[in-house]
Amino acid sequence: MNALGIQLQLRGTEHVPRSGGAVLACSHVSYLDFIFAGWAAQPSGRLVRFMAKQEVFNHRLSGPAMRSLHHIPVDRGRGLESYATALDYLRAGEIVGIFPEATISRSFELKTFKSGAVRMAAAVGVPLIPVVVWGTQRMYTKDHPRDFSRGQTLALTVGEPMTIQTGNPLGETARVKATMARLRDETIRAYPEMPQGAWWLPVSYGGSAPTLEEAARLDVQERRDRLGVLTARAQRRADRRWRLWPPFRKAT
């Protein structure tokens, strides 16, 4: 932080409880969000255990750090196991961080929310704390080069704890999203820079980021490309095993 000369704007950190379990629901615009969203709990002397996709834990650089901090890996094929682990953390009085949008928003608008955050809060009976992170997309996000130049401003806004009612996950998820949309707008308006046409600003604020619809198409293409890479990799492994299969070696 100091080495990069980051100007950090913190608002509402007093809303993070000093004890007991809580779900921290965070907006998602950057690969760095889990790092800076954790600062929301620091004034209360708390740590946040973030749920993050398995690929982050498999990475040679981020993996050791994620495991040492006891964050929670989310394997798409074993989602229930990750969910159960998160509930155990909450019951033990920990704060669990989750990104309801699941993936980075290329439009820098709020995407469709998954219901996991409200389901966890309702299941254990803990408050949900809405958090908005802004400015991290200028440093490291999808489709743009990294920029760690000095003096950038990062903003973090924490909303009041929300009591989540059971039996209506879709309605409660919509309520959380509406609350976070309001916090996001407040955060952007208080941000010291809003240059017209900036790539890191959403269209609704005069920026040139993709619209939600354009971003959705880019997300679909990204998934297709990733599937193509995984399929090709699996085919290469299969071809390699076939070439090494003993009967095939003798025949050649």
What residue spans do the PLM features occupy?
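Structural motif corresponding to alpha-helix initiation and N-cap regions
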Residues: 10, 59, 80-83
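A short, well-structured juxtamembrane/interface segment
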Residues: 1-20
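Short, flexible loop segments at the rims of nucleotide/cofactor-binding pockets, characterized by
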Residues: 1-5, 73-77, 106-107
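Catalytic core of membrane glycerolipid acyltransferases/transacylases, capturing the structured
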Residues: 17-78
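Non-catalytic C-terminal accessory region of glycerolipid acyltransferases
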Residues: 80-252
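Alpha-helical membrane-targeting segments
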Residues: 1-7, 58-69, 147-151, 250-251
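Short acidic-hydrophobic, aromatic-tinged amphipathic segments that line or gate anion-handling sites
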Residues: 10-11, 72-75, 164
